[in-house]
Amino acid sequence: ESMLHMRNGRSSKAHIYRLPYAVEVYKNGLVSKIIVSGGRNIGNANMVEADYLKEKAIEFGIKKKDILVENKAMTTWENMKLSRELMIKNNLLGECTNIAIVTSSFHMRRSIMIAERVFRDDGVNIVSLPGEDNSTRRTTWFTNEKGRVRAIGEVEKIIDYVKKGKIDDFEII
């Protein structure tokens, strides 16, 4: 059994870039459940990220019963911790052997490292499935200001998470 964890981040554009990819993965039978995660308010939708993503996922054809909603998290760390608690509450963690993370490439390393820490004792494989936008693709992030700013911000967050002991230190090669 596989679970897909999709987090929105700070933008309501996740339904444009990440959600279609998550839907494709689901419809191809690679995952049986989707967790949408995020508690930040989306002004244009007048709701929090996860609730908005759930509505969009249903519009895209995901069965309501296959969507779990984590709508309290304000950080990536909280996304993972609260999603794990949601899986435990719904008796899914023991059944699940793979957790696929859908987020952008620039955010993937930290997301995977946090997921590996949070799910460390649960016997699951963490898989990355980057859902891309145009400014932060692995091959283009450095060609535009938005991509460079996001990449630098992500490095700063990784350093902060290492200092706080939330992820393990590692060598950049």
For the regions a language model picked out, list residue spans one by one.
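C-terminal capping/extension of enzyme domains
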Residues: S135-I173
